[in-house]
Amino acid sequence: KDNNDEIKLSSLIQPNFTFTYDLIECELNENSSLLDLEFFFSKNVNKYKLIISNAVELSILFPEKNTNVSEFIIAIESNNNYESLKTFVDQIQIDKFNNIAVCEFIINQNNGFNILEYNKSFNPDYTLIEILTCEYNQDFNYGSFQITIARFINYIKKLDIPYSLSYVQNKSNNGFIWINTFHDENYEKILIDNWIEGEEALEIKDEFIENASCIESNVYKSYQLF
């Protein structure tokens, strides 16, 4: 009974969400190239800035390891701006974006917050994002997971690496999206040297696995349009 009460109590704990997040998956048409995509956005970006309020960040994500890129994601961080996002989606279709790529224009407005922000200077032209799609294990939730998150953050802060972390709640299931952002192209070496082999790091990873299972992980190069 006590354990059930703990589960019920932990399920009541929710993060202090500060933004909404949408990932729009796209695929280039066979007769289109990345140059076409770049030209389209450079031609229209100022118009889209006017349509979408200042509280919105829009980035294009390309798979990191894939040299022949045909798939990409439009990532939009906003603040419950459903109407302006809908206006943007309508306008991008009016501008015949479908001549360049086919996209799943679904606006989910999943709630998110930044667990850790890296505020020191870094190369703004290089941002690498790892998106993990995760589900909580049975009897686990954000309330039980936040202890592990706090321990992870304390550890990462001591390493002082160019890294940010965001948490996005998945409305469609008992899950979340864990977004690692690396601000240095040598991120793999930095992680191996500072994080992967440490004893405390292994303990934190075990706690993570106890709370949740991540069913998909993808790494992208991110280019922020505005």
What kind of feature is each model-predicted range?
Residues K1-L202, E207-F226:
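Short S/T/G/P-rich N-terminal loop/turn motif that feeds into the first structured element of a domain
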